[in-house]
Amino acid sequence: MSAGSAETVSTLKILGAGPVKRGVSRLAAGFEKQSGHRVTVEFAGAPGVSERVLADEAVDVAIVPQAAMDEFEKRGKVVAGTRGLMGRSRMGIAVRKGASRADIPDTEAFKQAMLDAGAIVCNVASSGVYIVKLLDQLGIADATRDRILRLPDTVKVMEHVAGSPAHAIGVGQLAEISELVEKGLGIALVAPLPDAIQNVTAYHAAVTVASRQQDAARALARFLAAPEAKAVFAATGID
């Protein structure tokens, strides 16, 4: 996994969204060692990241879900030929630590868990959009509408679940839930979404047209998408 080289040392900025943060942070540290460049990593909710990239903020590499990257390409906000797949993330369900955990092996069990939940907490980004649509597809949108709470990102979602009554359910990206559990947040992972209704989100990186150090940014984007990077992402729950 070669980072490339440059005569001038640059400070590169990665602005990203989603559960690839841990893997990206580890890879950024590796890129710094190999290239001599400095890399700052900032992650936020996908809608906010999209707004900033579309507004031509001075970002070198943007990392967002596939649909957002498609929009960046359509609007000419990323450099052609620099887009690369970081990995794919799946969704899961969490409750407050110590709360009872329902067995959710299939779609019917998921549907019942949603009907039984005192609150269904999800983000305002793609994960939350998917859950709201899924509840409608399952025919329980009306029954659950008043109990759905949308928050800016998965961290806020799971912090709310940790401080909520035991019957609240949080839904988000598995990798992010697992990271928060490891950090000691008072939540417990119940299960991934059942296979029949699982939602897989692909995360892509690309150099933005606003980057002021295109050569170094291209080297960083290649480093993040290199075959050797897959093992780093896999270790954080991204495949």
Regions found by a protein language model. Name each.
Residues 1-42, 47-60, 66-89, 95-239:
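Exported/periplasmic ABC-transporter solute-binding proteins
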